[in-house]
């Protein structure tokens, strides 16, 4: 596991948006950030699931709000509306974690329908690009914001049978590297995290015969995310990190 011990008030008063925060890694990270003092914005398309995570955070004394947005169907107007809402409510954004993702069909590229590739690229790449672009003024306003893209081992070394998902994660790594160079002078650090095998619904779909008890829970892989969101990672940008 990534070796980092987060101080008690690491993210005090920071505004952090986590996509795909209704379950899995996103939900665990949102709760972890709130426990360390952050005001967390939980994005997802399942309003009921988001509200449940939000209520758990509020019940434990944390600060959170929900942002219902379907990344598969969102257009420029929707992203602009999100940016305006956050500008009015917070005026800045200290952290943006692109966690939401779509697995798509685990088949050979030869067998991958073009529509399936387009759908996976929309959620895993285009949405991250469009949301980042819309929120750049708020990230700049924070002074030293952190932007995190979720990658995968199959986005760093191609593997047959991972089809559209692997292609999308290679694109994610490229997006991270370009943003890192372009935003360096703005003090915005941009990195990617490969969570590794984690006990999530996506993992279960990819490995249906695997015993989930043999892979780490989402809470176990949070240290790398917390490190990147906190001040200890100042100067760390353009890096492809592993959670475990």
Each model region followed by its residue ranges:
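Conserved glycine-rich cofactor-binding loop
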Residues: 20-23
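Rossmann-fold cofactor-recognition segment
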Residues: 59-75
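Substrate-binding pocket helix/loop in short-chain dehydrogenase/reductase
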Residues: 82, 107-109, 113-118
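Active-site helix of classical SDR
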Residues: 132, 168
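Alpha-helical segment proximal to the catalytic Tyr-Lys
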Residues: 137, 180-182
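Residue(s) in the substrate-gating loop at a strand-loop-helix junction
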Residues: 152
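C-terminal helical subdomain
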Residues: 185-188, 192, 200, 209-244
């Amino acid at each position: 596991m990534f070796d980092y011990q987060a101080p008690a008030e690491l993210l005090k008063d920071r505004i952090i948006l986590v996509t795909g925060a209704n379950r899995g890694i996103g939900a665990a990270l949102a709760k972890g950030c709130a426990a360390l003092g952050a005001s967390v914005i939980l994005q997802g398309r399942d309003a009921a699931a988001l509200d449940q995570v939000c209520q758990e955070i509020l019940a434990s004394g944390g600060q959170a709000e929900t942002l219902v947005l379907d990344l598969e169907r969102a257009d420029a107007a929707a992203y602009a509306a999100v940016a305006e809402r956050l500008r009015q409510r917070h005026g800045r954004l200290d952290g943006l974690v692109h966690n939401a993702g779509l697995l798509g069909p685990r088949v050979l590229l030869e067998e991958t329908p073009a529509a399936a590739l387009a759908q996976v690229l929309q959620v895993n790449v285009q949405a991250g690009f469009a949301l980042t672009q819309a929120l750049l003024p708020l990230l700049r306003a924070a002074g030293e914001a952190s932007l995190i893209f979720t990658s995968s081992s199959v986005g760093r070394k191609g593997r047959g049978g991972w089809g559209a998902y692997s292609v999308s994660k290679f694109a994610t790594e490229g997006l991270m590297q370009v943003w890192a160079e372009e935003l360096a002078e703005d003090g915005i650090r941009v990195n990617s995290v490969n969570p590794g095998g984690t006990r999530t619904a996506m993992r279960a779909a990819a490995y249906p015969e695997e015993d989930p008890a043999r892979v780490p829970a989402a809470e176990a892989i949070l240290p790398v995310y917390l490190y990147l969101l906190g001040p200890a990672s100042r100067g760390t940008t353009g890096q492809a990190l592993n959670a475990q």
